[in-house]
Amino acid sequence: MSKLKVFCFGFGQVAESFANKLIREKKNFDLNITSRQETHQIDFNSIKINSYQFTNIKFDSSILAKLQEADCILISIPPIEGKDIVANFFDANKKIIINCKWITYLSATSVYGDHKGNWVNENSLTKPTSANGLSRLEAEKTWKNLSNKNNYPLQIFRLAGIYSNEFNILK
């Protein structure tokens, strides 16, 4: 079986959990990620990961080749100053996806705004009230436009607040 080639823009809790799931399921995979630091290799739960520098100012050009090889791409970097730097990167480098089976953009439930305690789902009206919600909704629209224009296999997940032992409202 060939290796699954995974590329993660950002490597926060959700991306780490995804990688840990692949490890637990004994999947044969290569993982490349981005960080704000200079490009380097790290050990993550007994596997080697290449971490490529990616910021709103500069990026390691090796990312382009890795994206062309990627089977799946996970985007967990939030908008910076109201702009999605990953979407801007994709727009500027239009021919980067060749073998990609899916691109997942991690958004947030803040795009729904205040529904006064009523249930919301993916068909609910989006009416964000926070700067975060507004920038996430704008990023979703940008990704949908890129997907339509370039036939990207896009899926958007709207996540609620993520809490753990390290990150929670009580600490």
How should these model regions be labeled?
Residues 91-131:
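Conserved Rossmann-fold NAD(P)-dependent oxidoreductase catalytic core, especially the SDR/UDP-sugar
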Residues 6-11:
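Conserved N-terminal Rossmann-fold NAD(P)-binding element of oxidoreductases
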Residues 46, 50-69:
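Conserved Rossmann-fold cofactor-binding substructure of NAD(P)-dependent oxidoreductases
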Residues 34, 103-109, 157-159:
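SDR active-site strand-loop-helix element
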Residues 32-38, 55-57:
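N-terminal Rossmann-fold cofactor-binding loop
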Residues 141-165:
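Conserved beta-loop-beta element that borders a ligand/cofactor-binding pocket
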Residues 15-16:
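N-terminal Rossmann-fold NAD(P) dinucleotide-binding loop
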